[in-house]
Regions:
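Helix-hairpin-helix/helix-loop-helix acidic hairpins
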Residues: 101-122
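Hydrophobic/aromatic-rich effector regions of fungal transcription factors
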Residues: 137-143
């Protein structure tokens, strides 16, 4: 998914936003797939807005920009609340039965074809349509009745567009801890927006029965599900951050920070996984460093595939950049 900045700008200039508002909830809708670049600070939402406003009337671009505004809203909540976004914000999650990640989700073995295919796509590409994120999080939190944070951590780790604010607050919205009620969807809803026709699943029921379709009112897993699913049903999801950072260092040895390759008495521009702006101080002679801090990735782990995407995007678009793996205070 890596791309040059010039090529991405051409996509922005040629994008036709008119169908976005009416089709964005469908998995084959007119979405852009720009979120990895916006989340990395590589593509400016302001630039996108300016381009769309220049070439299209308000009726065409307003729906797109309203969705962009949600990301900005989540950022402002994170800015105000800090790490509290990792806890139930407005109300406590109710009826938690599982404390970790349900294995049918981790193993893409839920039996819901659209969801299982989406999990495979997430693992393979780091991309997941927004509606499928909602389906996955509601299945995890409200149907499997699992604590929302382990699921949010799992999804965050695999997304190329990982963003603590948007990810964790969206999961809280679905779980009902950052909204007035829990979000649920049945099989008919999933079929409609994913262009599938599956029937006979545990979600193929009326809404009033959905939240007891796997775990009943006595908090017991219905025995019919245990034929295809493991017992226990959940497992802790973990990522070995230290090993991943070592692998990144080995794969990108020629770009690893070397003090002898820097210019003395020259300012530094320090980039990170949320600031890969290719236009940042481009008219100045500076030392350019991509900072990958173990402390950050211990708190917000990502997979090696995601981290390599960040490195590749930086190397492709920021001339002369070096990679420093360490915490800022260690430099």
């Amino acid at each position: 998914m890596n791309i040059t900045y010039a090529a991405l700008l051409e996509q922005v200039k040629s994008y036709q936003p008119g169908k976005y508002h009416t089709t964005r909830n469908y998995t084959n809708g007119a979405v852009t797939s720009w979120s990895p670049y916006i989340s990395r600070g590589f593509l400016s939402p302001v630039l996108v807005m300016e381009q769309l406003k220049t070439k299209h009337n308000k009726q065409e671009w307003i729906g797109f920009m309203q969705q962009m505004a949600w990301r900005e809203y989540f950022q402002r909540v994170w800015q105000q609340k800090g790490d509290l976004i990792l806890q139930d914000l407005k109300s406590s999650q109710t009826n938690i039965i599982l404390e970790q990640l349900p294995l049918p989700i981790q193993n893409a073995n839920t039996g819901i074809h659209a969801i299982d295919n989406a999990i495979h796509q997430l693992y393979d590409t780091g991309y997941l349509h927004n509606h499928l994120r909602m389906y996955l999080s509601m299945l995890h939190s409200n149907i499997f009745k699992a604590a929302w944070l382990p699921g949010a951590n799992w999804m965050y780790a695999h997304l190329l567009d990982h963003d603590p604010a948007a990810n964790f607050l969206s999961w809280q919205w679905v779980a009902g801890t950052f909204s007035s009620k829990k979000y649920i969807a049945n099989q008919d809803n999933i079929n409609k927006y994913t262009n599938t026709k599956q029937v006979g699943t545990f979600l193929d029921t009326e809404y009033e029965y959905l939240q007891t379709s796997i775990i009943d009112d006595s908090n017991t897993i219905q025995s019919k599900h245990l034929v295809n699913w493991p017992d226990p049903l959940d497992q802790k999801f973990e990522i070995d951050v230290a090993t991943i950072l070592k692998n990144i260092e080995k794969k990108n040895q020629s770009k690893i920070f070397d003090i002898n390759q820097t210019s003395p008495n020259t300012p530094y521009c320090i980039y990170n996984s949320f600031n890969l702006d290719p236009l940042w101080h481009t008219d100045e002679v500076v030392n350019r460093i991509l900072l990958l801090e173990p402390n950050h990735f211990e708190q917000f782990p990502v997979t090696e595939k995601v981290l390599q995407f960040i490195v590749d995007l930086a190397i492709t678009n920021i001339p002369g950049i070096q990679i420093f793996i360490g915490n800022f205070e260690d430099y």
